[in-house]
Amino acid sequence: MDEILAKAGSQAVTFAIKSGISIASTYALKTITNFVVQIPKDDARRIDQLKFKLESRMAIVSSAIDLIKLVAARGNTNLQITLRLTKDLKEEIDRFDEKINEMTQKVEGSRSAKTQNEAIKAVENYIKDLLLRIEEITPFINLSLTTSGANLNSALPYQLSPGLLLKASDFVSENNRKYEKAMKSNEKGTGDKEILKVQVGPTFEVTLFSIFYNLTSENNGQSGIVWKEDMKRAKARIYRLNSTGRKYDYFMKIEQDFNDGRYHEDDDKEDTPQELAIDLNHIKKLFFSVSGKLLRLEEQDSPVLVLKIDRSDDKENESSEGDKGLLDDITWYAVSGYEAIEEDEEEDEEEDEEEGKDGEERKEEEEEENKLEDKDSSITLLEYIIRLTSLQSNDQKSILEVSDERLSIYLNDENTNSRKDRISNSTIEETEKKLKNLKL
């Protein structure tokens, strides 16, 4: 599915790229700074020099680890061995905080000069050992990146809209400020703390699709993959949620709107608006297609955003039988901007006239609600907000604090075939044929 969407000219970005160095290692470096204040000047000078060298090495190797993980996630099998090497190094760096704390506590909790000297020596040797490991693995990382042809270009892609990107960035930054303000107010309150959720940006009016598995076609030797319409009209909102252990945590809520020009039975309890919540941490890949026809959505010629959702990270002890289980964890959703049909609007007006006063009151309420709620139908703006909030969630820091290279990973298009002028009718027909014969 990933390959077909890429060949169909969809812009693509992989989100399964966590920051190479954990937040814990940053705190460990601060712990060393506090540690050197409590020890003799000669020892402090040596450890401070080692700390500076380690900090610079970690910053350099972090970018390389990010790039290796990104290229490997895109399907480069040549980097799998290097990925295992970097994984071991990253785990050692992640444990750095815990080990440094254990060693420094011996100095703080002991008055014995011998114990303090042993702790100082242990910290010094441990930092030297970690530096040696980084220096040993660096040539292999460089060689792997050179032979793979990968690069971490920080230039923005040509198809990126600067205006919409700035708008999305403003929405995310504004949400950061509102969230911090709400958290402070919540902390001042008495009793149980409320679960906070603060909306990011506007409400988007969308149409939601998901994959329908055609069992009849599967029995005939084909998967017959088909996109089915789940919600003709829906409201999509992105929220930042306070959670234990995570400063930045987001989810997208999609709520069906029955005011879609279709018949719905008000008295039928089973016929109620649907809701869908998607944890942004579960979005592993995002595709942006300039035309819904590439997905065999005949009535959707407008842009479509495709989300690959993988919930397997929530399962700690995954069985090795695994391939089927892993596939079951993957869900595909497609979102396009909702397009109102004029005929439906005219029919609604006629029905309101027939219903008289009740209809007018309901219409006035809907108009008032629309005025109060900031709405947008730009799928591209929604895409940029998802990219930026996913970056904050993965790195656990503000987009204003991340490096250009990290920002580039989440904004660049990894698909070289995504130019709009390359998409022809033959491309659409070829994609439709592949989707029809796709086996999942």
Swiss-Prot record:
Query: Does the record carry Cell membrane as a key word?
Result: no
Compositional bias of kind Acidic residues: 341-371
Q: Where is this region: Disordered?
A: 341-375
- A Pfam family (short name) is Ran-binding
InterPro entries assigned: Ran_GTP-bd-rel
Record lineage: Eukaryota, Fungi, Dikarya, Ascomycota, Saccharomycotina
Q: Which GO CC terms are listed, alphabetically?
A: cytoplasm; nucleus
**What does the subunit comment say?**
Interacts with GSP1.
Record GO biological process: protein transport
- List modified residues, type Phosphothreonine: T272
The extra comment attached to this record reads: Present with 3670 molecules/cell in log phase SD medium.
Species this protein is from: Saccharomyces cerevisiae (strain ATCC 204508 / S288c)
**What protein am I looking at?**
Ran-specific GTPase-activating protein 30
- Where in the cell is the protein located? Cytoplasm; Nucleus
Q: Which GO terms fall under molecular function for this chain's record?
A: GTPase activator activity; GTPase regulator activity
Chain's role: Important for the export of protein containing nuclear export signal (NES) out of the nucleus. Stimulates the GTPase activity of GSP1.
Q: RanBD1 domain location, by residue?
A: 1-314
Would the keyword Nucleus be found if you checked this record's keyword annotation? yes
Lineage: superkingdom: Eukaryota
Keywords for this protein: Cytoplasm, GTPase activation, Nucleus, Phosphoprotein, Protein transport, Transport
